[in-house]
Amino acid sequence: MPFSDLGILLGDVSLLEIEHYTKDPMKAQNMTLRKILRRNKNSELGKKFGFADIHSIDEYRKKVPLTTYADYEPYVERMIHNREKNLMYTGRNVRYCSSSGSVGKPKILPKSVKDLWNMQCIGFSCSVSTAAHYIKKTKGKRLPAQMGPLVLVLTGHPLEDGKRCNGAGQVPLTYLKPITRFFCTSPASLLYPEHEELLDTSYLQLRFALANRNVSYLGSIVVTLLTTMFDYLEDNWEMLCDDIEKGI
């Protein structure tokens, strides 16, 4: 079974879940809020705002003020620098995600196992499932076995507490390292380099992708990474063809 079929299966499950919850959004919102309050009532933040005594959306609005990232940053700093637990939630913190920093300092948020699973299924597998159903409906064909370059770096960087931090969009692929060779032309050493800041990947991404006749997709989180790669191809196609021909 192609590994893309596994992505389709996980995506189908997530799409069914989305369909179920969007049938009655307010009911889903109320259930989700109650679940969050129940699970995190014993965290420092939960005790501060009295999560244990909140039983409705209206009560939550009255007791919990509107907040910004600045309200949570001190908790995140304590987790990173002091390795403190049960601050914002009671689940086990597995790793961190960061924003791009395009509008200032990158915002770092801790992620639990449940968060990572949701990011995996909704952030990655749903798109594969949606593409598969679209191709089947419009062309009457199966989604081809997926193979192509992933133009991104998944290594991340370690923080003071030893846990790694990636951009949120990278996380779903971070945990697929053991199986990337089944759907990715980019070798693991290129996706998970030891010193990513020293590596320009354009040549290597193209060198491995152009030599593979089974390429069916181009993958990236940011489209400019793909356009940069194609700019490199336009300027250096003769060298790439020569290297492929000679087996360099």
Question: Where do the PLM segments sit?
Answer:
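Nucleotide 5′-phosphate-binding alpha/beta core
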Residues: 1-98, 104-248
